[in-house]
Amino acid sequence: MRVAIIDYGSGNLRSATKAFERAAREAGIAAEIDLTDRPERVATADRIVLPGVGAYADCRRGLAVVEGMEEALTEAVEKTGRPFFGICVGMQLMSSRGLEKTVTKGFGWIAGDVVGMTPEDPSLKIPQIGWNTLDLKRPHPLFDGIPTGENGLHAYFVHSYHLAAERAEDVVAEAGYGGPVTAFVARDNKAGSQFHPEKSQALGLALISNFLRWKP
């Protein structure tokens, strides 16, 4: 199995690659973790990971300038049905639009816009930086065996925006930060986390292992 982590100049690429390598090794899964900026490698991968940090529009633009990459993503994910995992802004790009600074069109895989967070408690700072627990809204294979809720494992967040999904069934998990914040979405063969699994220690490694086993 070959897992393509897309290198388009954004995301914690080194730490993401190492986290996927470690998760595969510890789970006893034979997987080649392929950090690549080559569309042909993405189009033929068994699983695809899209990291992303920074502004929505910048990440969208960065992906667009890699010739053939968006077409490769569409071929692998939409047409062939390969499992896809978006991380942070990589997850946000799954949305219809991003409303950060300007209106930017997303992939349209998860209906909804990426909007600024507005905590009810004014003492809560934006961005949210740090650890938070997850409220699982519905079962999903990527959370098999992972303790969630107040006494569950913690995930690591760094963000000022979140995906306001139009369909409740697309939201797998939320976090509380002065109100509900979308933490994980999934539809069909596509999944994405607002938090950083590569920085989320036990939760992150378990989530990645489940992704490597996932057969949507």
Curated annotation (Swiss-Prot):
State which Enzyme Commission number(s) the record gives: 4.3.2.10, 3.5.1.2
Keyword Cytoplasm listed? The answer is: yes
What biological process terms from GO does the record include?
Answer: L-histidine biosynthetic process
Which segments constitute the Glutamine amidotransferase type-1 domain? 2-216
| Hydrolase as UniProt keyword | yes
Major location (coarse): cytoplasm
Q: Coiled-coil segments, which residues?
A: none
A Pfam family of this chain = GATase
Keywords from the named record: Amino-acid biosynthesis, Cytoplasm, Glutamine amidotransferase, Histidine biosynthesis, Hydrolase, Lyase
Q: Which reaction does it catalyse?
A: 5-[(5-phospho-1-deoxy-D-ribulos-1-ylimino)methylamino]-1-(5-phospho-beta-D-ribosyl)imidazole-4-carboxamide + L-glutamine = D-erythro-1-(imidazol-4-yl)glycerol 3-phosphate + 5-amino-1-(5-phospho-beta-D-ribosyl)imidazole-4-carboxamide + L-glutamate + H(+); L-glutamine + H2O = L-glutamate + NH4(+)
- Active-site residues? C88 (nucleophile), H196, E198
GO CC annotations?
cytoplasm
Report the protein's function: IGPS catalyzes the conversion of PRFAR and glutamine to IGP, AICAR and glutamate. The HisH subunit catalyzes the hydrolysis of glutamine to glutamate and ammonia as part of the synthesis of IGP and AICAR. The resulting ammonia molecule is channeled to the active site of HisF.
Q: Quote the subunit structure annotation.
A: Heterodimer of HisH and HisF.
Query: What HAMAP family does UniProt report for this protein, alphabetically?
Result: HisH
Protein name in the entry: Imidazole glycerol phosphate synthase subunit HisH
Organism equals Rhizobium meliloti (strain 1021)
